[in-house]
From Swiss-Prot:
A Pfam family: GAF
SMART domains: GAF, HATPase_c, HisKA, REC
Catalytic reaction(s) noted: ATP + protein L-histidine = ADP + protein N-phospho-L-histidine
Organism of provenance: Synechococcus elongatus (strain ATCC 33912 / PCC 7942 / FACHB-805)
Stretches for region N-terminal domain, not required to complement the deletion strain: 1-183
Protein's recorded name: Circadian input-output histidine kinase CikA
Family: In the N-terminal section; belongs to the phytochrome family.
Phenotype of the disrupted gene, per the record: Shortens the photoperiod by 2 hours as well as its amplitude, and offsets it by about 6 hours. Uncouples kaiA and kaiBC expression, cells no longer reset the clock in response to a dark pulse. Cells are very long. Half of KaiC is always phosphorylated, phosphorylation phase is disrupted. In double labA-cikA deletions KaiC levels are much higher than either deletion alone, but the phosphorylation ratios are nearly wild-type. RpaA is highly phosphorylated.
Subunit structure comment from the entry: Homodimer. Part of the circadian clock (KaiA, KaiB, KaiC, CikA, RpaA, SasA), the composition of which varies during the circadian cycle. Interacts with LdpA. KaiA and CikA compete for binding to KaiB(fs).
């Protein structure tokens, strides 16, 4: 598109009044085919008004604004006949229309049409189409004009030159517009070669695009240079199908270029051959090719991109020898320059696309790698969590037995123990305690990292927590000849704190145990506790070996310890401080260390006060508990034990059955007030029980409460259940649900005992 400010005009032509009127009609029909069209001409004015405005026409449409001027007001007043031919001029652009209307006070409302367009740019294709209309009007008007006014023919060469210039400008504008609008080089070259052939009235137009590697490899050979057809790409346009196509490698197996031609091409010079007989003696192979494809005259123009030969623009005349004109050479050179710009843009765009694609591929590869790594890590983490969940009970139970039994043996046996026996049993006991401590740390750390740890927030006394924790380590400190000191900077007003006391106790035990472990005999360990606003600060200081500054950063990393000699002397796994940091951050707090080698270390922990969860409703009163039994169907011992203990502690009477067949047989005998069933069911017999309850809905039967580990397949089951609870069970929700489903207590004797 041409910018709206670039007003275009065509050279002035001469038309008779009849020819001008025909041109007005043709323009009106042309504009009517365009979107947002507006047309007005002076034929609608009275004759005396036309003597003031002159003959004109205004056409406005999307991409097209034109002012057509015929006889001026002054020419209307001249004495020569009105039938004489007059100059006709054409101006493009909204500015030309506005200036003319303001100068002549033309009575036409054109402004709304311009305002409706918004975009006042010009479309070169529409300008070209109107130029064809103008040429046709001049040609139709010229035949009678030549007979009446012979002098008009004197202007014919000038008109031809103007027409040629107009076509040249149109073609260059079209190529330029296509370059701006498209980055498809093949499309640009195909369109350009067709327009060039038509403009030159040539029989064949060709663009040869050399492949870079062919030139680099071929320039070292002997001259004339031979470029095989597989080393270039050919774009061709022919006048008709009767002419042979040079795209066919059987017709043109390659290009021959002489030394002189190549040197001229490198300088950007055009080669004009009016007769191919020029090659008969100089390059017989080339002459033979031209005879085969019927070429009489040839024009060759190099296309240079960044100073390097990219290809050739070639035109063939096949009917007769043709004397190439300078104007033909000039337009081909101009087009070659514009093509050079288009090619360079396409190359840059191609490089950018390649780089973009490469980067996108890298991003996709890295993203996929990250996705795979994440999936692998998630799978590993899930496997670890599943393993730890499965093994936690299996690990802790035998260790508890080992510790418990060895402790019992140390205190009681069927006879006196020898010193060695006592040492052996004590070694078993101590090793078991150490192993249990290690396993607990690993399981706790894994639970926190998996996001499964939750705080049990409640109010507690900071001073009592600190005192009890310190007392726990008194024996260990006494054996190491280390003095434990407690500094409580608290009063009764700030002593009560809301957090998870069990987790805080674990934090303090880890820090104090470390302090005792790394403090030499006769040393001192201090525990200081104070409040700062809504935060509690715990500080553990020791007079131990200290920690080098270079190693302090890795203290809170899992399985990280000090150097090997210290690890051999003091032991440890490197989990305690990592777990401590996780527990502190679980509270939303932070931990800090200050240490000097040979003087000791100080760990300071800041814990913000936690928000207390809503108080749990009181346990149902025994006086309000219903009479009767609750029937529990659960195959897992641990899950059943938890539910039984929970309900028994609340005052309910529970009957636990593993299979549904027993429950079905004894349903009338047991007469439960509620049936609790785990889903998926333990066995198929439970499904028979459900079917029985469904088929006897008309009869009174106890409410059904389901514990869901996964959603039920049968939608009728959901409708049949009186309540559905998710695993793991919420104790308060279970008790509240049962209280709502159970019938009221009718007799004192049937109440469950406490």
């Amino acid at each position: 598109m041409l910018a709206p400010s670039s007003n275009c005009s065509l050279a002035s032509q001469r038309l008779t009044p009849e020819g001008f009127a025909q041109l007005q009609s043709a323009l009106q029909d042309f504009v009517a085919t365009l979107p947002q069209a507006f047309y007005w001409d002076s034929r609608s004015l009275h004759t005396h008004l036309r003597t003031q405005t002159g003959d004109c026409a205004i056409a406005i449409a999307a991409g097209f604004q034109l002012l057509l001027l015929g006889r001026t007001a002054a020419e209307y007043c001249q004495p020569h006949p009105l039938s004489e031919p007059h100059h006709v001029s054409v101006q493009f652009g909204a500015d030309s229309i506005q200036r003319y209307c303001q100068a002549t006070n033309l009575p036409v409302e054109y402004q709304p049409a311009l305002a409706q367009l918004g975009d006042l740019s010009l479309n070169p294709d529409l300008i070209s189409q109107f130029s064809n209309l103008l040429i046709a009007a001049i040609a139709a008007d010229r035949a009678p004009l030549a007979a009446q006014y012979p002098a008009v023919s004197v202007c014919q060469p000038l008109e031809q030159a103007l027409h040629w210039q107009e076509e040249q400008d149109r073609l260059i504008s079209q190529v330029s517009a296509q370059i701006r609008l498209s980055l498809d080089l093949s499309e640009i070259l195909t369109t350009t070669i067709r327009e060039i052939r038509q403009l030159l009235n040539a029989d064949r137009a060709i663009i040869y695009q050399f492949k870079p590697q062919c030139l680099d490899a071929g320039l070292d050979q002997r001259w004339p240079l031979y470029i095989p057809s597989q080393s270039y790409i050919t774009y061709e346009d022919r006048r008709n199908e009767a002419l042979l196509s040079v795209i066919d490698p059987l017709v043109q197996p390659g290009l021959l270029i002489t030394t002189e031609e190549w040197q001229r091409f490198q300088q950007g010079e055009t080669l004009l051959i009016d007769s191919v007989g020029f090659y008969k003696e100089r390059l017989p192979e080339q002459y033979s090719f031209y005879e085969r494809v019927q070429v009489r005259s040839v024009c060759k123009i190099p296309i240079l991109v960044q100073g390097r030969i990219w290809g050739l623009l070639v035109a063939h005349q096949c009917q007769q020898d043709h004397r190439w004109q300078p104007r033909e050479r000039d337009i081909l050179q101009h087009l070659a320059e514009h093509l050079s710009i288009a090619i360079y843009q396409a190359q840059l765009y191609g490089q950018l696309q390649d780089q973009t694609q490469t980067l996108e591929n890298r991003v996709l590869e890295r993203t996929q790698e990250l996705i795979d790594a994440l999936a692998l890590a998630q799978a590993a983490n899930a496997a670890k969590g599943e393993f730890l969940a499965t093994m936690s009970h299996e690990l802790r139970t035998p260790l508890t037995c080992v510790i418990g039994m060895s402790s019992t043996l140390l205190r009681w046996a069927f006879g006196p123990l020898t010193e060695r026996q006592r040492e052996y049993i004590k070694a078993i006991h101590d090793s078991g305690e150490h192993l249990l401590e290690l396993i607990n740390d690993i399981l706790d750390l894994s639970q926190i990292e998996a996001g499964k740890a939750a705080l049990q927030v409640r109010p507690f006394s900071l001073s009592r927590l600190a005192t009890q924790t310190l007392n726990t380590l008194q024996e260990k400190a006494r054996l190491g000849e280390i003095q434990l000191m407690l500094d409580l900077q608290l009063n009764n007003r700030v002593d009560v704190f809301r957090a998870d006391p069990k987790r805080l106790r674990q934090i303090l035990i880890n820090l104090l145990s470390n302090a005792v472990k790394f403090t030499e005999p006769q040393g001192t360990v201090f525990l200081r506790v104070w409040r700062e606003g809504d935060r509690a600060i715990f500080q553990v200081s020791d007079t131990g070996i200290g920690i080098p500054e270079s190693e302090q950063a890795q203290l809170f990393q899992k399985f990280q310890q000090l150097d090997t000699s210290i690890r051999r002397q003091y032991g440890g796994t490197g989990l305690g401080l990592a777990l401590t940091k996780q527990l502190v951050e679980l509270h939303g707090g932070h931990i800090q260390i200050e240490s000097t080698v040979g003087q000791g270390s100080t760990f300071t922990v800041w814990i913000p006060e936690q928000t207390l969860i809503e108080p749990v409703e009181p346990r149902p009163s025994i006086d309000n508990l219903p009479a009767g039994h609750i029937l529990l169907l659960e195959e897992e011992d641990e899950a059943a034990t938890v539910v039984c203990e929970m309900l028994t502690a609340a005052g309910f009477k529970v009957i636990w059955l593993v299979d549904g067949s027993t429950a079905l047989d004894q349903l009338d005998l047991l007469q439960p007030i509620v049936i609790l069933m785990a889903w998926p069911p333990p066995d198929q017999s439970c499904l028979l029980l459900l079917q029985h309850l469904r088929e006897h809905q008309a009869d009174p039967h106890p409410p059904l409460v389901l514990f869901l580990g996964e959603p039920p397949v049968d939608p009728l089951l959901t409708a049949q259940a009186s309540a559905i609870l998710s695993k793991p069970l919420d104790p308060q929700l279970l008790l509240t649900t049962l209280q709502g489903l159970c019938p009221p207590n009718l007799s004192e004797g049937d109440r469950p005992s406490s």
